[in-house]
Amino acid sequence: RSFPPEIGGMQNLMGGLANALLNHGPVKVFADKFEGSDVYDQSLKLEIERFGGIKLLRKYRKANRLNDFIKSNQNIRSIFFDHWKSIEKINDKVIEKIPTFCLIHSKEINHPLGSSLNKRVINSFKKIKFIIANSNFTKKLGIEIGLPKEKIYVIHPGCEEPIEVEKEYELKAEKIYQDSFPKIITVARLDRRKNHQNILMCIRNLKEIFPKIKYVSVGDGE
C-alpha cells in the first residue's frame, strides 16, 4: 500500500526497510503503481512488482498474487506488511510457517472496540507473528483495541544516513534560524489530525524558558 516514489512517512519507511534488507539477501516487493514508479523502480536493486487498476480489485489481485508467490517459493525467510489491510486477504495457512511482521501506527488501528473495522483489524493480525509499533503510545493503543500484548514490539522509525548538505541550503537554514536556540524542525503534512495546533501551544509555553526558540514546519496542507 505504501511505497516510494509516493511521498509519505510510511512510504519512506517501507522503502528504507526494503533497501536495508538487501544486506541480508534478495528482496521482492509487491506495491501499488504510482506516477513515476517505472522510472523509480529501474534505479533500485530491488525486484518490484506493481499493481494498478481499481483499488478494490487491486487489493484482491495483489493478495492472490502474493499467495501464489509464497506457495511456489519455499525459501522465503520473512515477510513484511505495511498495513493490516495488506494482510486481510492473505491465506493464513500459506504464511503460518514464515516469520511475518506488520507495522502499526495509531491512525489505522484506532477504531471503536467491537466495531466492524476493529474486528477486521484483530482478525488480520491473528495471521501475523510480530506486530511492530512505532512508539509505546501505539503499543498501548494496540493492546487497548484488542491486539495481543505478547506480539507487539516497539521499534522507533529509522532514517537514512545523513547526506552532505549543499552550501545553498546550508545558508538558507542559517538565514531562517540565525541565533535561535533550540532549533526545532518537523516534516509533516499540515493536516488537523496531526495536531500541529498542540505543538504550537507547547512552543508558546516553551518560549518563556527559551526566548530564542524557533520551530520550523515543512509540509503541504492548509
Describe each region flagged by the PLM.
Residues 2-5, 187-191, 206, 221:
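Short donor-sugar binding/catalytic loops of nucleotide-sugar-dependent glycosyltransferases
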Residues 33, 137, 158:
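Carbohydrate-associated surface elements
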Residues 112-113, 143, 158-175:
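Acidic anion/phosphate-binding donor-loop and adjacent secondary structure
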Residues 167-183, 208-209:
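Nucleotide-sugar donor-binding and catalytic loop/hinge architecture
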Residues 176-194, 200-203, 216:
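Conserved donor-binding/catalytic core segment of Leloir-type glycosyltransferases
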